[in-house]
Amino acid sequence: YMNRGVHEGYEGLVVYHFNSDKNVVEEKAFIPISESYEFLKRDLGKLSYVNEQNELFLLFAQNLYKVDIEGNSYEILEEGIKYDNFVASDNNDHAAWLITEGDSKGCIREIDFDTKKTRTITCEEGQRLRTAGFINEDLVYGILEKSDILTDSNGHRSEGIQTLRIEDFDGNVKKEYHRDGLYITNISVGNTLIEFELSAKSGDTY
């Protein structure tokens, strides 16, 4: 809630810049939102990055924003991003997410925020993709079959990934892991370490 300034009385996110020469705080962008503080804090903790072109990239309310700090403007780069499907590198200069709408629905889109270049990762028919995280600047993602998405009698859904890949922005596969007859579950990606469990399918669960 804005309690002063040009947007007093409105709810939104404001980007300020401190001008050391003038010793004043300047408003650079105002993005109206209705999201609660708790969700806003969670989303901004996922991504907040400024590149050398003085462009700020933020994720909140399921949208990826680019704020032009010098131009006092903003634009939405992607809409409908689910929080759990969005991953960013440790220093936030790369990010990837599962596309949820349009012709590329189900694919993964990755972006380099310094160059603003993007790439799209596709899968074969009957397969599904899942973002897992980053090892340095390399994307970690999983490939699973649609038939390996299980729902038990209580309505709980579980997924078993068949192949886990580490891939750089140019599409070069750095490492790939697969075990016949077993499924990769409970994946945790740290800065330099990937942990997961190998599970067997048992009825409608793993």
Question: What positions do the PLM features span?
Answer:
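Repeated scaffold domains used in trafficking and secretory/extracellular systems
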Residues: 33-49, 79-91, 125-137, 178-191
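Short beta-strand elements that form the blades of beta-propeller/WD-repeat-like
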Residues: 1-16, 45-60, 92-102, 132-152, ...
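Long amphipathic alpha-helical scaffold regions
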Residues: 81-144
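Surface-exposed loop/turn elements that mediate protein-protein interactions on large endomembrane-trafficking
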Residues: 6-39, 59-79, 103-125, 151-181, ...
